[in-house]
Amino acid sequence: MLNKSRGKLLGVLALFLVMVWYSIYREDSFYFPVQDNRTSCPLGEVERKAPQLIGNYSRAQPLFLQLRDYFWVKAPSLYELPYGTKGSEDALLRLLSITHYSLPDSIQRLNNAPVQGYEQDVGTRTTLRLFYPESAHFNPRAENNPDTLLVLVPFKPMDFLWMEAILNDKKRVRKGFWKQPPLIWDANPEQVRILNPYYMEVTAAKLLNLPMRQPRKVKQKPTTGLLAITLALHFCDLVHIAGFGYPDSAQGKQSIHYYEQITLKSMAASEHNVSREAVAIRRMLQLGLVKNLTYF
């Protein structure tokens, strides 16, 4: 089923819009020029160019984790979350047993932000919505389409426990989060997916050159925005990005996202290496791997 779905994915003209208003604190400023989006979608174009940026580039990995992959594990994961599942297999098995599924036929867009009230700027269609517990403060039914897939990006074992408790209506998990996640979340289990940590590993190791094993007090992780682009590079023939920018740190009042008033200053102590992310995105633009739709 996976191979069949992957074949459909590669055969479909996929337009992958990452609508994350993504402005980050740093000392220097990066401005990505607007590129002409009146471009045809050449089949296999991204797949041909991606190896120039991503070493050992492969489209063989599944997008989501599936139950069948964890009953008889012949090659256990080498890394803990968010780059692997080492040490979290039991919790993952329980969660996967709730969210059994098959892959969709096509992926058109990835969006991790509100739609209602912003339709003119971000459109109305959301095929995939990336989230993690602390970012799940949205209505799964009101802010999505009926067939939107809710994709959990697991950063830590507690994320699996929270998702399991929500879907099974068990005692809620309250500790172990940097921000309190929702205690009530009206989601259809059949629409929930667990992202394959492989793509977080590729983003960190191949695009940002971050070590997979870091001291506990120094934990640098990719942002979900850069992760979203990495996913697109592995599944689409044409990748457009919108809203990505890195203004000068002097613009302290600049909001991070289009839908809230949190400013750049809040990113000063984050776990994200935004300098490397800016360089990675600029390299993608230079290679023609992605097209920029907006000027920040």
Residue locations for each model-derived region?
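Metal-ion/cofactor- or nucleotide/acyl-coenzyme-handling active-site neighborhoods
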Residues: 1-296
